[in-house]
Amino acid sequence: MVRMNVLADALRSICNAEKRCKRQVLIRPCSKVTVKFLMVMMKHGYIGEFEIVDDHRGGKIIVNLNGRLNKCGVISPRFDVPINEMEKWTSNLLPSRQFGYVVLTTSGGIMDHEEARRKHVGGKILGFFF
């Protein structure tokens, strides 16, 4: 079966496993965007550590869950978000100002909206988690 959106499938698997109170989830196939998105989630403590397994096919990622994640999702299509419109997107997607993160892909790499605001860069919106 052909996967249309690898990141969306990965985040849906994580969200479903979190709802079922699982401790680990297996994500396949592996992609660079998925790994960077998981790095942002791990940096903020929403997931535990993850391990990338190279099986010479598509690769696998084993993610340890810690029960802190409420919801995560992908925004499709990937809208352009200039710096001055970042507040509009965060207020639409997140439940409150101090809670959750919007993930962007920028010229400086994949980062959350707070880091993008500090670095004063805009980009395309990938997804969110809280």
Swiss-Prot record:
Q: Which InterPro entries match?
A: Ribosomal_uS8 (IPR000630), Ribosomal_uS8_CS (IPR047863), Ribosomal_uS8_sf (IPR035987)
What's a single GO MF annotation on this record? structural constituent of ribosome
- Which SUPFAM superfamilies does this UniProt record tie to the protein? Ribosomal protein S8
Gene Ontology cellular component list: cytosolic small ribosomal subunit
Query: What's in the keyword line of the UniProt record?
Result: Ribonucleoprotein, Ribosomal protein
Gene Ontology BP terms: translation
Keyword Ribosomal protein attributed: yes
Question: Which family is it part of?
Answer: Belongs to the universal ribosomal protein uS8 family.
> What's the protein here called?
Small ribosomal subunit protein uS8
Say which species the protein is native to: Strongylocentrotus purpuratus
